[in-house]
UniProtKB/Swiss-Prot annotation:
Name of protein: Probable RNA-binding protein 46
Domain of life the protein comes from: Eukaryota
Alphabetical UniProt keywords: Cytoplasm, Differentiation, Meiosis, Oogenesis, Repeat, RNA-binding, Spermatogenesis
Pfam families, A to Z: DND1_DSRM (PF14709), RRM_1 (PF00076)
Compartment annotation: Cytoplasm
Organism, scientific name: Xenopus tropicalis
MF (Gene Ontology): RNA binding
Key word Signal present: no
Length: 534
């Protein structure tokens, strides 16, 4: 007991911890028999609990708690969360001042209790006018490895990663969208545990690390979204990967209808992957077993059940530890040892551009505050900001290029005349770092009435092809796992932009927009030097 007290209040003279709080925490330890220690900016209660034998609980037993009042501690929080089940470990993030940082992680002894805690305590009014947010927290066991030679096969990459790191379970390698004999220049390495992944990252990151004579890039990969079994039992949409770029939706529908005609409701194809919607779940399950590994237009496809979106309200971790609505799809938390936690929090997210079935975009948050006379303002570098400080797709794309040490995107403006005689606009985006001297570019297939909207749409379209993939369960439900997905983007750092909002503009007619022809170049805009040309 005395040792526990020493660890728990180690350096307590530096903290403004009230005597009443100390007494309450000591009483909690005495009543429960749990240990409590403070280390690396977090206070750990339990882990393991008294009398525990065997390994820690499996992945999926931990929940994240946000919007905790700063002056609330374990003496109030632990009894509350114990209502859902036996707590294996409670970790409260702490400030140096002694206040908590507004969030915590609670690990239960099984997944059922963790899910019950979410149902019971998400949006729970913990004190008058204060509501906490609770959602699933997942240990990240995957690393992103970039700048891999594109001719290397999965077996070679797996063998090499096992040589240089321990605990490797598998590697995920995607073929190029344009050449199926090559990989995309990156892979995801699966480890047996979060600790194994963290140790591997620590070994690979400090300095330039080479494989096959190439300096590789290493980063945490966004963990795969986990969906509860009850929800997955309702899914009747298949996710089909590794298609040829030239394969059409009609071909895919015909192939999946072959085993039983008329079972496919619709198909949505995006670059080299597609979503196949079935009229019934049993049709989808049967088709998955029959079609997985089959050849379509010479490409061997991978078929899995699409993962639906979590429809509950999402929360976002701010710098002060509080959570707000309208969040990114996934939130990542790194502790001082470089380990990472990812929270599975999907909510309203952007659909495929201008899909008639897409949901309404979220309105941007109100972020204006009064500037009181005498307020001290400090000059800062634009790229020292965090991702949540950017809202527009144009800024996200520029930030994305900066993070990958690429030159900034180049925007080329095109125009055409609509059926009503109105001028319509579209931008073509060129990324010199990945297109080189080729004619490759990114250009949306929709036109806008206003130049600002056209540029924003082009930037989002480019980001989608660099880093987005979509997993709808219907035309109105879509999620965004972070997966680099473009041929020629080897070594791209994983990056998940937030959803964007646009002002309303009239829907454009289906005008053929090509590079040249009847659509003339009107304007070139560079992020570094703007000039006009005829």
């Amino acid at each position: 007991m005395e040792d526990n007290c020493t660890d728990m209040f180690n350096g307590c003279s530096k903290f403004d911890i009230s005597i009443q709080t100390q007494v309450a925490l000591l009483a909690l330890i005495d009543n429960t028999g749990y240990t409590m220690v403070q280390v690396n900016g977090q206070r750990k209660f339990g882990g393991p609990p008294p009398g525990w034998e065997g390994p820690p609980p499996p992945r999926g037993c931990e929940v994240f708690v946000g919007k905790i009042p700063r002056d609330m501690y374990e003496d109030k929080l632990v009894p509350l969360f114990a209502r859902a089940g036996k707590i294996y470990e409670f970790r409260l993030m702490m400030e140096f001042s002694g206040e908590n940082r507004g969030y915590a992680f609670v690990m239960y002894t099984n997944k059922e209790e963790a899910l019950l805690a979410i149902r019971m305590l998400n949006n729970y009014e913990i004190c008058q006018g204060k509501f906490i947010g609770v959602c699933v927290s997942l240990d990240n066991c995957r690393l992103f490895i970039g700048s891999i030679p594109q001719e290397k096969r999965k077996e070679e990459i797996l063998e090499e990663m096992k040589k240089v790191t321990e605990g490797v379970m598998d590697v995920i390698v995607y073929p190029s969208a344009t050449d199926k004999t090559k990989n995309r220049g990156f892979a995801f390495v699966m480890y047996e545990s979060h600790r194994a992944a963290a140790m591997a990252r620590r070994k690979l990151i400090p300095g330039p690390f080479q494989l096959w004579g190439h300096t590789i890039k290493v980063a945490w990969a966004s963990p795969e979204k986990e969906v509860d079994e009850e929800t997955m039992q309702k899914v009747k949409v298949l996710y089909v990967r590794n298609l040829m770029m030239s394969t059409t939706e009609e071909t895919i529908k015909a192939e999946f209808n072959r085993y039983k005609p008329g079972v496919v409701e619709r198909v949505k194809k995006i670059r080299d992957y597609a979503f196949v919607h079935f009229f019934r779940r049993d049709y989808a399950i049967a088709a998955m077993s029959v079609m997985n590994g089959r050849l379509i237009d010479g490409a061997r496809i991978e078929v899995t059940l699409a993962k639906p979106v979590n429809k509950e309200a999402a929360w976002r971790q701010n710098g002060n530890g509080h959570m707000n609505a309208n969040s990114e799809c996934l939130l990542n938390f790194a502790n001082k040892e470089g380990s990472q936690k990812a929270l599975d929090m999907c909510s309203n997210v952007p659909a495929y551009l201008n899909n008639p079935n897409s949901p309404t975009f979220l309105e941007p948050e109100t972020c204006t505050y009064p500037c009181i006379p005498g307020t001290k303002l400090t000059p800062i570098n634009l790229y020292s900001l965090k991702i949540h400080h950017f809202h527009s797709a144009v800024m996200h794309l520029e930030y994305f290029c900066y993070k990958n040490n690429w030159s900034f995107p180049e925007y080329y403006l095109y125009s055409t005349t609509g059926q009503d005689g109105k001028m319509l606009l579209a931008y073509k985006v060129i990324l010199p770092a990945i297109t080189g001297n080729t004619n490759s570019y990114f250009m949306p297939d929709k036109l806008c009435s206003f130049v600002e909207d056209a540029k924003e749409l082009a930037a989002q379209f480019t980001l989608m092809h660099l880093d987005y993939s979509y997993h709808p369960t219907s035309g109105k439900n879509i999620s965004l796992p972070s997966t680099a997905a473009t041929s020629g983007t080897s070594g791209v750092l994983p990056y998940t932009p937030k959803p964007y909002s646009y002002s309303s503009y009239p829907s454009s007619p289906n005008v053929s927009l090509t590079n040249g022809g009847s659509v003339g170049k009107q304007l070139y805009v560079s992020n570094q030097a703007s000039y006009f040309s005829g």
